[in-house]
């Protein structure tokens, strides 16, 4: 199946087995709602895409499904689910075409008498044909041979290594010899061949690429050898609060990433790159570094459009023109506030200067002068001169 094909679990509603919708949904990520890509399982047994869960845990340290506490270091690869998904994606188009309900035109209903007559006539003819066919020895022998072939085919199973039909009681010996041999036997060397090409008899008629699936599954056990050791080292996270802007910029420069922008932009760029790089290591077929850088640039472009402010217009003349009225209003408010404050201080100073004060700083109180009595004049006038 092509990765660009848009599929949805509701596609199975118009097939002969609508319950396959549940199987299709269980193979999709709860975050991006697409088929798992490098699935990782959490400590609470939930599975997500490697990139989706790493990007989510960067902002929310919890499981998106059950909200349980989770850390990126606890994530583990879900290899068996990835193999099941690869097989399902191969057979999905053929399975969908096989189970698709065809729009067959409804037959025109006839009169009841005619229908009954035709049914009875056809029934009599079929009964006579059955009697004639069953009575001949050749037909009996043919039927016996057909039944024996059917039973013989039911006793056969597919070898998971070479996809050949092998009797079920000999599958263990055949599997040992098939895996130990330097080259697996080809499907043409098997004495049993699937000759049933009819789509209506069995699901074994699907033309799937079993050999390629088997090879990918066998290679999964040696997935550690797919990348060199130096390319499989995961990038550590950084504590940006302890790093200066120049240090973060140098880290990005060492990785060959853009170094323009302010510190917050550099932090987001580095964090996104760590998520992209580490999730790419979980892929069976990791993409190149150039592809990852292109994804990072596309992500930054989308982020800048969502904010609605272009980088080159920050602090420019367009910004001043757009908010000129707001700036003028803020300036007027600041001037008015300063004027009111100065008037208040001036009035307070005038009031304090008009009040008399003592040396100790407190206002002076009005005190009447002391009463003085001239004792000399009063004493002379009353007694007179003495001789």
UniProtKB/Swiss-Prot annotation:
Biased composition regions of type Acidic residues, renumbered to the chain: 122-131
Catalytic reaction list: S-ubiquitinyl-[E2 ubiquitin-conjugating enzyme]-L-cysteine + [acceptor protein]-L-lysine = [E2 ubiquitin-conjugating enzyme]-L-cysteine + N(6)-ubiquitinyl-[acceptor protein]-L-lysine
Metabolic or biological pathway, per its Swiss-Prot or TrEMBL entry: Protein modification; protein ubiquitination
Biased composition (Low complexity): 177-192
Zinc finger (UBZ4-type) boundaries: 156-183
Main localization (coarse): nucleus
Name of this chain's protein: Postreplication repair E3 ubiquitin-protein ligase rad18
